C-alpha cells in the first residue's frame, strides 16, 4: 500500500547503513525520537520482552540531525591525502574500532574511528582481474589509475601477464600522481615500508613484476628488453617529497655505509654499479637527501627543491622496536611531508601508507 507519510532516508556511518525514518517531526530532538519500550524477540505470544537500549533514542536522533545538517559540496578541494592501511578490510576496521572504544572504557562496538565522522564515505572494489585473493600491487594500481588489473603488476593493464616485460610497454596506465604533476600539483609519498614496495610504487612505477625493486631481482632478458627496475623509475619520477625505507635498492653492492638509524649495515644490492641517490641528487642542486630522524626534524620546511628520505635499508622498524633506532615514525614523516608540500604549492597530493 502506498503511504503518504513523510519519509526521510539518509546514510550514516562507515558501513553506509541506509536508514529510512517515517513520520518523525521535523524538529525531532535527541530525547524525543524514540521512547524506550519493550522489544520482543519474535512475534510469538510467548516471546520474551527485552528492554530497548537506552541509547537508541539519542543515537538515531543524532544521526538524523547530522544528516539534515549536511550540505552539497560547493567548492573544489585544493589538496588531498590518500591514507592506505595495508589489508584494511572491514574486519580490520571493525577490530580497530572495537579496540579504540575499549581503550576509552566502553564496550567498543559503538565507537567511531576518525574517518567515520567525515560527512561522506564509500566502498571501493579493488579486486584483481586474475585471482580472488588480491595483492597490494594490483589493488593499489586500481586505486591510483581507476583500472583493475592483474596481481603482481604495477601501473599496467590486465592484458599483460605478470613478468612480461615486452607486453608491459604496450599497456601503461597513467596514475593519479602523474596526472597531478601534469596539472601543476606538488606530490608526495610517505610509507614505513620500502619506498619501492608495491603500494607506494603504484604511485609512480609501471612494471609487470612488483618484485623488480632493484635490478638485482630482474632477469637478464628483462634488462636487455629495456624494462627499468622500480628504484630507477622513482629517480625518473617527478615527486617532490619521498619518505620511507628501502635504501638498499638505490645503492651498489660496493656501498657499505652504516645508517645512523640502526638496522645494521646499509649495504647496497644493485649489480649495475649505479648509485641512484647520487643520480637523483644530480638532477637539481636544490634537492635534499636525508637518512635519519634528526635530519628530518632539522629540515627546513621551506626548502625549495625535492626531498628524498630513506631511513632504513629495508622496511622501517615496527613501533615497539623503534626505540633503539633513529628512525622517524609514520607521524613524523607525514607531518613533515605536509609542511613541505604546503610550502611548495597551494595544491598538492600526498599518499600515506
Predicted regions and their residues:
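N-terminal low-complexity/intrinsically disordered extensions
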Residues: 14, 31-33, 352
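N-terminal catalytic scaffold of extracellular/periplasmic and nuclease hydrolases
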Residues: 28-305, 313
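Hydrophobic alpha-helical segments
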Residues: 12-13, 82, 177, 334
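Bacterial N-terminal signal peptides
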Residues: 12-23
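Anion-binding catalytic surfaces of enzymes that hydrolyze or transfer phosphate/sulfate esters
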Residues: 293-353
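Bacterial N-terminal signal peptides that target proteins for export
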Residues: 2-14
Amino acid at each position: 500500500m502506498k503511504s503518504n507519510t513523510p519519509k526521510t532516508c539518509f546514510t550514516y556511518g562507515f558501513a553506509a547503513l541506509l536508514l529510512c525514518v517515517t513520520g518523525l517531526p521535523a524538529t525531532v530532538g535527541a530525547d524525543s525520537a524514540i521512547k524506550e519500550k519493550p522489544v520482543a524477540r519474535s512475534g510469538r505470544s510467548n516471546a520474551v520482552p527485552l528492554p530497548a537500549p537506552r541509547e537508541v533514542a539519542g543515537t538515531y536522533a543524532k544521526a538524523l540531525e547530522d544528516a539534515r545538517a549536511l550540505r552539497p559540496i560547493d567548492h573544489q578541494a585544493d589538496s588531498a591525502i590518500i591514507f592506505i592501511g595495508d589489508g584494511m578490510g572491514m574486519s580490520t576496521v571493525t577490530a580497530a574500532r572495537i579496540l579504540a572504544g575499549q581503550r576509552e572504557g566502553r564496550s567498543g562496538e559503538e565507537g567511531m574511528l576518525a574517518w567515520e565522522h567525515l560527512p561522506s564515505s564509500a566502498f571501493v572494489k579493488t579486486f584483481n582481474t586474475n585471482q580472488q585473493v588480491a595483492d597490494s600491487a594490483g589493488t593499489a594500481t586500481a586505486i591510483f589509475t581507476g583500472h583493475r588489473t592483474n596481481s603482481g603488476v604495477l601501473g599496467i593493464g590486465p592484458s599483460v601477464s605478470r613478468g612480461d616485460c615486452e607486453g608491459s610497454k604496450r599497456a601503461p596506465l597513467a596514475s593519479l600522481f602523474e596526472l597531478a604533476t601534469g596539472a601543476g600539483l606538488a606530490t608526495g609519498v610517505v610509507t614505513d615500508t620500502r619506498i619501492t614496495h608495491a603500494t607506494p610504487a603504484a604511485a609512480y612505477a609501471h612494471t609487470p613484476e612488483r618484485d623488480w625493486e632493484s635490478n638485482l631481482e630482474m632477469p637478464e632478458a628483462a634488462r636487455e628488453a629495456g624494462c627499468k627496475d622500480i628504484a630507477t623509475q622513482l629517480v625518473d619520477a617527478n615527486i617532490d617529497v619521498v619518505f620511507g625505507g628501502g635504501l638498499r635498492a638505490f645503492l651498489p653492492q660496493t656501498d657499505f655505509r652504516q645508517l645512523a638509524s640502526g638496522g645494521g649495515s646499509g649495504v647496497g644490492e644493485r649489480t649495475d654499479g649505479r648509485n641512484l641517490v647520487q643520480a637523483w641528487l644530480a638532477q637539481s642542486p636544490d634537492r635534499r637527501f636525508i637518512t635519519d630522524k634528526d635530519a628530518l626534524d632539522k629540515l627546513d620546511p621551506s626548502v625549495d627543491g625535492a626531498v628524498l628520505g630513506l631511513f632504513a635499508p629495508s622496511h622501517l622498524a615496527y613501533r615497539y622496536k623503534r626505540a633503539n633506532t633513529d628512525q622517524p615514525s609514520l607521524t613524523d614523516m607525514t607531518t613533515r611531508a605536509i609542511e613541505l608540500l604546503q610550502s611548495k604549492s597551494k595544491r598538492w597530493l600526498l599518499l600515506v601508507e
